[in-house]
UniProtKB/Swiss-Prot annotation:
Disulfide bonds join 27-81, 41-73, 42-60, 82-91. It comes from Emericella nidulans (strain FGSC A4 / ATCC 38163 / CBS 112.46 / NRRL 194 / M139) (Aspergillus nidulans). Induction: Expressed after 12 to 24 hours post induction of asexual development, which correlates with the development of metulae and phialides. Expressed in vegetative hyphae. Keywords: Conidiation, Disulfide bond, Secreted, Signal, Sporulation. Its main location: secreted. It is found in: Secreted; Spore wall. The keyword Disulfide bond applies. Residues 1-21 form the signal peptide. The keyword Iron does not apply. Transmembrane segments: none annotated. Self-assembles to form functional amyloid fibrils called rodlets. Self-assembly into fibrillar rodlets occurs spontaneously at hydrophobic:hydrophilic interfaces and the rodlets further associate laterally to form amphipathic monolayers. Aerial growth, conidiation, and dispersal of filamentous fungi in the environment rely upon a capability of their secreting small amphipathic proteins called hydrophobins (HPBs) with low sequence identity. Class I can self-assemble into an outermost layer of rodlet bundles on aerial cell surfaces, conferring cellular hydrophobicity that supports fungal growth, development and dispersal; whereas Class II form highly ordered films at water-air interfaces through intermolecular interactions but contribute nothing to the rodlet structure. This is Unclassified hydrophobin dewD.
Amino acid sequence: MHLSTSAAAILALSLAGPTMAGRPYFCPLALDAKFLQVPYCCEGFVPARDSKVSFEGVNCIDVSSDEDFVKTCPKGGTPKCCYSIGPKVICTTEVGDGVDK
C-alpha cells in the first residue's frame, strides 16, 4: 500500500494529535521531510546537507519534556523545532505557542 504525501501527513497528525494536547509549545511537521519535531536548545547551527530549509544543530538538548517549559534556552537563544536522525539533530522551524496545561 502506498500513501500519498498528504495522506501520510494526515495520518501522522491524527496519531500524534492526542499526545500533543496540553503542551505549552507547538512544533509543526518538519519542512524538509515531514517528520514530527520537538523543541531543542542548540549552541549553534550549520546548514544541513542537501537542504535549503533545514539546519543541523550543534550540541543540542531536547527540552520537550522539561516540566517548566520556557522559551529561552539555558545558554541564550530560543528553542527550535527539530527532529533527530541518529546522532544528528535537524531543525526547520521556530517553536510556536501551544496549549498551557
